Every structure is written in C-alpha cells, then in structure tokens.
C-alpha cells in the first residue's frame, strides 16, 4: 500500500513539475529575455506585420528579390496541404526524379548555367527566408531595371544587409532586403 501511495505522489509531482512548472518557467524566460524570438521574430513595416524573419515568402514581382523555391509551395495551396498534411519540409527527391527536374526547369530558365544552387533548389525546411549573396547579386540587374535605379545601388544594399555564414556562404534575408528596397529613396 505504501508503494502505491508513493507511486501516485511521485506521478502527481512529476506531472505538476513537467506539465505546469517547467513550461511556465520556459515561457516566462522566453517572454522576458527573448521576447522577439519567442513571438516568431515578426517584422513590421508601416505599422503592420508583414512576415517573419524566420519563414520565407513567395515573391513574384520583378521589383523584388525572389527567395528560394519552396518544396511545400510556402503553404499557399490549402488543398495540397490538406491532402498530404505537410506544412514544412524538403521534397526528399533524388537528383534524377522527374518531378524535381520539372520543378527546377520551372524555376530556372532552361540552359542558363549562370544560376546559383539556392535559386534552383528548395531548402531542407522548404521555408528558408535566406538566399546567398551571390544569388541576390545575380537578381540585382532585374530589380534595378524594374525600379529604374542603378545596379550598383542595389548591390550596395545587398552588401549592407549581408550576414556572414559560419560554414556557409554569406547570405541575406529576402524579406528584410525587400523592405529595404521599398524604403530606399530614388
């Protein structure tokens, strides 16, 4: 009888500690010391939330930088999401997969060997908000033409916004770069 009572007490104490006190402590620490990160690293522009620093968006206008292709189409197709239940993730397709090849041809003009790998392939999460500086610089002439500004101004903006990779190439956040473009004075 004593063993059963001890087991029940230990179970209740463990449930209170692990199910209430620990999550409460982690939530409080997050909200006090890491408020921006704990709430999704949201970015505001013109007093409204326009996205997250951590999740890529689908950009199609020629006046903006385009992010990486998304294996989950940035969850813009609710029917597809409903069918396979995937909200993020890579495609896990091999190099010879016909669907992958078709998707890469869709994202890249066929025969253009001057394309960075991140312009043609999706990331592991399918929602990567960054592109390499090299990719951004290759998009600069298109953006400069669409905005009627010099390519050097766009390149300077890219260099100013680049983040150093530790074991990777230097990269830029596409949403932050596009907001900086909109803020740029002609």
UniProtKB/Swiss-Prot annotation:
Q: What keywords is this UniProt entry annotated with?
A: ATP-binding, Cell membrane, Ion transport, Membrane, Nucleotide-binding, Potassium, Potassium transport, Transmembrane, Transmembrane helix, Transport
The question of whether NADP is a record keyword is answered with no
The annotated topology with respect to the bilayer is:
Single-pass membrane protein
Q: Which Pfam families match?
A: KdpC
GO MF terms listed in the record are: ATP binding; P-type potassium transmembrane transporter activity
Transmembrane parts of this sequence: 10-30
Q: Could you give one GO CC term from the UniProt record?
A: plasma membrane
Q: State the compartments where it is located.
A: Cell membrane
Q: What does this protein do?
A: Part of the high-affinity ATP-driven potassium transport (or Kdp) system, which catalyzes the hydrolysis of ATP coupled with the electrogenic transport of potassium into the cytoplasm. This subunit acts as a catalytic chaperone that increases the ATP-binding affinity of the ATP-hydrolyzing subunit KdpB by the formation of a transient KdpB/KdpC/ATP ternary complex.
Q: Which family does it belong to?
A: Belongs to the KdpC family.
NCBIfam families registered for this protein in UniProt: kdpC, PRK13998.1
- Quaternary structure? The system is composed of three essential subunits: KdpA, KdpB and KdpC.
Q: Which HAMAP family match?
A: KdpC (MF_00276)
The record's PANTHER family line, in alphabetical order, gives: POTASSIUM-TRANSPORTING ATPASE C CHAIN, POTASSIUM-TRANSPORTING ATPASE KDPC SUBUNIT
Name of the protein in its database record: Potassium-transporting ATPase KdpC subunit
UniProt lists the gene as kdpC
């Amino acid at each position: 009888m004593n063993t059963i009572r001890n087991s029940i007490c230990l179970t209740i104490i463990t449930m209170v500690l692990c199910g209430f006190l620990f999550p409460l402590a982690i939530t409080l620490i997050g909200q006090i010391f890491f408020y921006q990160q704990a709430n999704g690293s949201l970015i505001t522009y013109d007093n409204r939330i326009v996205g997250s620093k951590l999740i890529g968006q689908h950009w199609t206008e020629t006046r903006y930088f385009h992010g990486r292709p998304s294996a989950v189409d940035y969850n813009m197709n609710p029917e597809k999401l409903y069918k396979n239940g995937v909200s993020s993730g890579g495609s896990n397709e091999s190099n010879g997969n016909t669907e992958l090849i078709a998707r890469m041809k869709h994202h890249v003009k066929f025969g253009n060997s001057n394309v960075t790998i991140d312009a043609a392939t999706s990331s592991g999460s399918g929602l990567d908000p960054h592109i390499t500086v090299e990719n951004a610089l290759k998009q600069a002439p298109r953006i400069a033409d669409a905005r009627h500004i010099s390519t050097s101004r766009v390149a300077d903006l890219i260099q100013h916004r680049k983040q150093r990779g530790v074991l990777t190439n230097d990269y830029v956040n596409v949403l932050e770069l596009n907001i900086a473009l909109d803020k740029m004075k002609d």
